[in-house]
UniProtKB/Swiss-Prot annotation:
HAMAP family listed in its UniProt record: Flippase_ArnF (MF_00538)
Keyword line: Cell inner membrane, Cell membrane, Lipid A biosynthesis, Lipid biosynthesis, Lipid metabolism, Lipopolysaccharide biosynthesis, Membrane, Transmembrane, Transmembrane helix, Transport
GO biological process: lipid A biosynthetic process; lipopolysaccharide biosynthetic process; transmembrane transport
GO CC annotations, alphabetized: plasma membrane
PANTHER family from the UniProt entry: 4-AMINO-4-DEOXY-L-ARABINOSE-PHOSPHOUNDECAPRENOL FLIPPASE SUBUNIT ARNF-RELATED, SMR FAMILY PROTON-DEPENDENT DRUG EFFLUX TRANSPORTER SUGE
Cytoplasmic side: 1-3, 66-76, 122-137
Encoding gene (name): arnF
Name assigned to this protein: Probable 4-amino-4-deoxy-L-arabinose-phosphoundecaprenol flippase subunit ArnF
Top-rank taxon, per record: Bacteria
């Protein structure tokens, strides 16, 4: 059950971090450059998107901390790479981002996904599980 909690927390972290990236990109692309902040009134929707993205990053961090409690670092950390694929797919698919698919980007993201799958593949020889809260005999 602890491993399931870890996987769910890692999934939550990936989804929230991906949403944060997209929200930050959408909001920041609609705000003036910092040197023009004094002379312009920023778009409220853009400010809200950036604020929500920052909140999503904070929630993602909390999920990440929960994932680290239940998963080995090497396994959990590789799962964060799934957000690269998710952000790429969504940014290129959604018209709000004006991003495009390309062969080289798709190949690169495919390699990242292959790496995540490789790191998280089940091992054939079961190694004894070690959990930091359990004391060794």
């Amino acid at each position: 059950m602890n491993a399931l909690r870890g996987w769910l927390a890692a999934l939550g972290s990936v989804l929230l971090a991906s949403a944060a990236q997209l929200g930050m990109r959408w909001g920041m692309s609609r705000l003036p450059l910092p040197e023009a902040w004094a002379g312009q009134t920023p778009e409220r929707a853009a400010l809200l998107a950036v604020a929500l993205a920052v909140a999503a990053y904070a929630a993602s961090l909390l999920c990440w901390l929960a994932a680290l409690r239940h998963l080995p670092l090497g396994r959990a950390y590789s799962l964060l790479s799934a957000s690269y694929a998710l952000v790429y797919l969504l940014a290129a698919s959604l018209p709000a981002f004006d991003e495009t698919f390309s062969t080289s980007k798709t190949l690169g993201v495919g390699l990242v996904v292959l790496g995540v799958l490789t790191v998280n593949a089940r091992r054939t020889a079961a190694a004894p599980a070690h959990h930091p809260s359990r004391k060794a005999p």
